[in-house]
């Protein structure tokens, strides 16, 4: 059992509640690293996982629950890791990385308290966001949580693609995944803007009050340059302001889309919808701002359609000029029980290359025995 949960509490509760209920105490706050897992007596002991975990991360985080998409019944939760602060007055071109997780992945406090998934807690939403922030420095990192998790293990992206009980997709050309993603991000941008600007106003008001109080002090120690130490401190306080970047307008930024394992079903559905998305004013403009798409060891429990293999569909992707990256491991493409995955991956690459796409296709850990650990480790090597 994870070090983040009391073994006694888990033993007591395991027979009484479902695994999901073990972590229902997680925070729903919009700002700050997610709170500790509230499980039994350990919840108030000060030894929860959230406090120690947040100390290992660089804030700030924004956790946005139930962000609406294109339709009222479609909503997803998002976790945003902001890029580092920039000096006041500095404006940088914004890039946003949008990540779709795979099975078992969740917030750290949820995974660390799960009787099975705790062993993969290193690949939690927060840790993945941190890895991606290093991989794409200066970018906004968005983690899109699936709308349903069957048996607390199988990620189901029902808002993006028709899915069975375990999240295996049934792709079509008109489900509305592009419309949902565009609206979801637009609404998430606005929510993040409102939160950050509100907090910035509060900080600015507090800073101005401190400067006013500083300058009103009557006593000061003379300095060698003729300025008092109080004046120097006040000047330093007024000039040292930095602020975290706020998401800009959707049309003024660029995007990278990343799917891992089951999360690749979202990318595939987007590809199936490309032809129609190009015709729509909003999704067409959004599409032009997508610079790259990464498939990271895609796979799901269905018997086919792990990779897009229809030439007429992939032709639409080739015409966009979007960078295509495919990173796989033996866990998926060498699986003898799911041999179609490897065949479909090869066909995906072959068709795109035939269409003139310079696809970045890489096999990682090819000399190793297929393992779930290396499947997750693709995040560290792609």
Model-identified regions with their sequence ranges:
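N-terminal cap/lid segment of alpha/beta-hydrolase-fold proteins
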Residues: 2-96, 140, 169
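C-terminal catalytic histidine-bearing segment of alpha/beta-hydrolase fold enzymes
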Residues: 4-22, 27, 34, 325-382
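Short, surface-exposed "cap/lid" segments of acyl-processing enzymes
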Residues: 58-163
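Conserved beta-strand elements of beta-rich interaction domains across eukaryotes
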Residues: 102-105, 147-149, 262, 299-301, ...
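Short coil/turn segments at secondary-structure boundaries
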Residues: 110-115, 154-158, 269-273, 305-310, ...
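Well-ordered, non-membrane alpha-helical segments in soluble/globular domains
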Residues: 117-129, 167, 171-188, 233-239, ...
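Short acidic, low-complexity segments enriched in Ser/Thr/Gly/Pro
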Residues: 146-239
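Serine-dependent carboxylesterase/thioesterase catalytic core
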Residues: 196-322, 333-334
């Amino acid at each position: 059992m994870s070090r983040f949960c009391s073994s006694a509490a888990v033993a007591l509760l395991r027979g009484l509640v479902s695994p999901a209920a073990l972590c229902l105490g997680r925070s729903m706050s919009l700002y700050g690293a997610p709170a500790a897992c509230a499980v039994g007596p350990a919840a108030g002991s000060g030894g929860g996982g959230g406090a120690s975990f947040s100390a290992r991360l660089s804030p700030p985080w924004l956790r946005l629950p139930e962000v609406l998409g294109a339709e009222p019944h479609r909503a997803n939760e998002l976790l945003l890791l902001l890029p580092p602060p920039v000096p006041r007055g500095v404006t940088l071109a914004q890039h946003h990385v949008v990540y779709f997780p795979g099975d078992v992945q969740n917030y750290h406090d949820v995974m660390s308290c799960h009787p099975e998934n705790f062993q993969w807690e290193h690949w939690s939403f927060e840790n993945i966001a941190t890895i991606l922030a290093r991989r794409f420095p200066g970018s906004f990192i968005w983690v899109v949580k699936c709308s349903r998790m069957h048996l607390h293990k199988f990620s189901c992206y029902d808002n993006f693609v028709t899915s069975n009980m375990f999240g295996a997709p049934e792709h079509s050309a008109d489900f509305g995944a592009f419309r949902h993603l565009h609206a979801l991000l637009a609404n998430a941008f606005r929510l993040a803007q409102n939160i950050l600007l509100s907090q910035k106003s509060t900080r600015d008001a507090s800073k101005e009050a401190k400067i006013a109080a500083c300058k009103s002090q009557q006593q000061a120690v003379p300095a060698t340059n003729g300025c008092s130490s109080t004046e120097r401190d006040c000047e330093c306080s007024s000039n040292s302001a930095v602020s975290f970047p706020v998401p800009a307008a959707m049309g003024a930024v660029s995007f990278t889309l990343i799917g891992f394992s089951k999360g690749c079903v979202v990318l595939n559905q987007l590809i199936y919808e490309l032809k129609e998305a190009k015709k729509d004013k909003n999704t067409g403009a959004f599409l032009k701002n997508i610079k790259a798409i990464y498939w990271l060891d895609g796979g799901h429990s269905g018997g086919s359609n792990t990779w897009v293999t229809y030439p007429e569909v992939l032709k639409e992707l080739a015409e966009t000029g979007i960078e295509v990256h495919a990173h796989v491991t033996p866990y998926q493409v060498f699986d003898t029980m799911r041999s179609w995955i490897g065949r479909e991956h090869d066909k995906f690459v072959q068709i795109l290359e035939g269409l003139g796409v310079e696809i970045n296709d890489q096999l990682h850990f090819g000399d190793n025995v297929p393992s779930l650990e290396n499947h997750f480790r693709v995040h560290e090597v792609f």
